[in-house]
């Protein structure tokens, strides 16, 4: 899975727990969108997290 170009977020790991508290490995995936943004004055298609887009850290081209 890709990671966010702006924030560096990537999938995280942990355990899911049943009612008996048995542990099973699982992952949490980041909500990534492939968007075109300006990088060094040129448009580039990169993976950006939805949170970075909503907070205005990047502008779409």
Swiss-Prot record:
Alphabetized InterPro entries for the sequence: Bacterial_rp_bL28, Ribosomal_bL28, Ribosomal_bL28/bL31-like_sf, Ribosomal_bL28_bact-type, Ribosomal_bL28_sf
GO biological process entries: translation
Any one cellular-component term (Gene Ontology): ribonucleoprotein complex
Gene3D superfamilies found in the cross-reference section: Ribosomal protein L28/L24
GO molecular function: structural constituent of ribosome
Pfam families per the UniProt record, alphabetical: Ribosomal_L28 (PF00830)
Keyword Cell inner membrane tagged: no
Keywords from the UniProt entry: Ribonucleoprotein, Ribosomal protein
Methyltransferase keyword on record: no
UniProt record similarity statement: Belongs to the bacterial ribosomal protein bL28 family.
Name by which UniProt lists this protein: Large ribosomal subunit protein bL28
Native species: Geobacillus sp. (strain WCH70)
Gene from which this protein is expressed: rpmB
